Amino acid sequence: MSSQPKLRILCLHGYRQCDQSFRQKTGSTRKLVKALADFEFVNGIHSVAVDEHSETSRAWWFSNADQMSFSSREPTDVSVGFDESVNAVVKFIEDNGPFDGLLGFSQGASMVHLLIAKAQLGEIKLPGIRFAIFFSGFLSLSSKHDTLTSLRIKDFPSMHVFGDSDEIVARPKSEKLADQFDMEPIRIAHEGGHLVPSMSKHKERITQFLREQMAPIASA
């Protein structure tokens, strides 16, 4: 008897993180749903040069071209390195896919949203990807992304997890991102701050969400 197929989820880390550090930070969540999903991690291609640990400190794009830094709070007219990161993620998916879903934290969550929007506009292809999970997500404040951030995301299941004590990405910003999805998003609030929380209190909800996404692969 063959084992039940698992979902494959591609994970995008936050600003000044990397694939390996994000793997560690998501350990408890991955363990919680290990029977349902396998997780793979992609590394941002841009080093945060001002950080002494630049090899393990990465970004998807920069909002300040002079300092080559990023802020989720300040509007900007630039998105340095964004297009290169889009191409890198698309190439990673082509080389290592297929994947069923995307998961992102903070800037990585914003990147996930922008990738989905670009796919829905037909600008890129994300073969097989049909759902997303966001931790501390937010809408990009770069005017370069206005077409993407104003787009209503259609027919795309999503789960949004945010902290009531998050001082970097306040809950209303994550709620605003969730509002862009026309298919009623799953929203989970936790008491913590800017982190990927233990999801043990919400095991039933995340398990149910993932099981719903498994239907296409179970019938394949």
Swiss-Prot record:
One of its GO terms (cellular component) is nucleus. SUPFAM superfamilies: alpha/beta-Hydrolases (SSF53474). Keywords: Hydrolase. It is an enzyme of class 3 (hydrolase). This is Esterase CBG03338. InterPro entries: AB_hydrolase_fold, FSH-like_dom, LovG. It comes from the Eukaryota. One of its GO terms (molecular function) is hydrolase activity. Gene3D superfamilies: alpha/beta hydrolase. Its EC number is 3.1.2.-. Belongs to the LovG family. Pfam families: FSH1 (PF03959). The active site is at residues 106, 166, 194.
